[in-house]
Amino acid sequence: MASMRDIKRRRDSIQSTGQITKAMKLVSTVKLQKAKGKAESTKPYSDLMYETICNMLARSGNINHKYLQAGESERKAVITITANRGLAGGYNTNITKLITESGIPKEDIDIIAIGTKGRDYLARRGYNITDDCSDVINEPLYTDARDICDKLLERFADGQIGEISVSYTHLRAHETE
């Protein structure tokens, strides 16, 4: 049977763990709000861009452009955007699950990894990581996105890949996550 001292020590340990957990929750809430603010600030721009492209395609009729046609190759390039660290809930898992459960043989997929968690997970499962851009995840710039796109479009034009996809999730309200 535990002595009174052992019980008191265990109680103090549990209270201490509770305080640490509460502090971690506060820090994660602040980080989430900051990330959410950044994501929401780009939404009007991306919505208008999407609407503009849809209107242009609807009004222009049949467009014959090499980037709107299926490529010659069976290989597919997939840009995966995950976190560099864990503790992101199901975010990293959901992104990698999109790829692993896509039904496409892993031999036919080239992964462009943005974020170490997705890169490491997919590499362990035998996927071909052709590009690692994990260093851009913390402070992404337009030039970083352009460089990644330029490389992919060059590979598409050369016939090395026949399709380019992006695996991503949508930001929902915090209460529903």
Spans of features found by a protein language model:
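A short, hydrophobic C-terminal helix/tail in secreted or cell-surface proteins
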Residues: 173-177
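Conserved loop-to-helix interface motifs that mediate assembly, gating, or partner/ligand docking
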Residues: 2-172
